[in-house]
């Protein structure tokens, strides 16, 4: 992973703007879905990276963030994981509301960079920025998942782990439409 190259890519193809429905948070977001997909197709293939799901504040993440901002005690003094974080909006909301520990996890290195960049512009310090954590022992009080069960293979991969985390006492919240 080359953070400088990834940051340049994010800066070139997104703009920093407030999130609709959650104006307390600003994110680097694609201004239009088509240009980023077209402009990045070859580059992404060369880097072996997934499409730029991180470049959008998806409704599920916005719903989690809105809930956290409106109900700050939900995250206060908790160890929070934003799983399959994408842009990191849920983690940023947790940081703005006094979470004790904030970790983002995403297998896409561009998403990891986007989370770091988005946290920085929102004056949030991420405690950890992780890649593939599925299967690791649960270390969190609260696991936030924005629309991670949209494909059967992904769901089959993560569901047993999320259930195990819940069985050890973590609260697991999955938002999807």
Regions found by a protein language model. Name each.
Residues 1-36:
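N-terminal auxiliary segments of SAM/dcSAM-dependent transferases
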Residues 155-177:
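C-terminal substrate-binding/active-site "lid" region of AdoMet-derived donor-dependent transferases
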Residues 143-144:
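Hydrophobic beta-strand segment of the Class I
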